[in-house]
Amino acid sequence: MTLTQFIKTNQGKKVDFDGKYGAQCVDLYRAYCRDVLDIQQTPSVAGAKDIITKPGVLEVTRDSALADYSRGDVLVWDATSSNKYGHVAILVAVYNTKYFIVFEQDGFKQDGAKLAFRSREGLLGCLWRNGGY
């Protein structure tokens, strides 16, 4: 399955990969690993922010001024004062130096998977599959 097919299939749906805690951002990430990347699941994590330290077979790029992000990369954000778990989303496009267009799911709102603008603020980096998408 391609990223475009994944988005079309899951847009507006509540993706609950593990059947626990409702539809969270990590559930969409795990479905993406299964359906698009076709890789073994990465290790369990306490929150989305921890995915970057347990990438499994995926490569890691830490955020910096020189970081180069590509469509299909898995972006990981750190915890905030209002979200101790962090966030994970799939990169659809780089909008500019400060924003991305992502495919994501919000575990707090429980409103299903959607395309959204997401700030680079708090970005830890990304996971990507060696060999492309």
What is each of the regions a protein language model found here?
Residues 98-101:
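Short aromatic-glycine-enriched beta-strand elements
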Residues 105-109:
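Short, solvent-exposed aromatic-acidic interface loops
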Residues 1-93, 103-104:
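Secreted/periplasmic proteins that engage bacterial cell-wall peptidoglycan
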Residues 94-96, 118-119:
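Generic beta-strand structural signal
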Residues 1-7, 111-133:
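Intrinsically disordered, low-complexity, charged/polar segments
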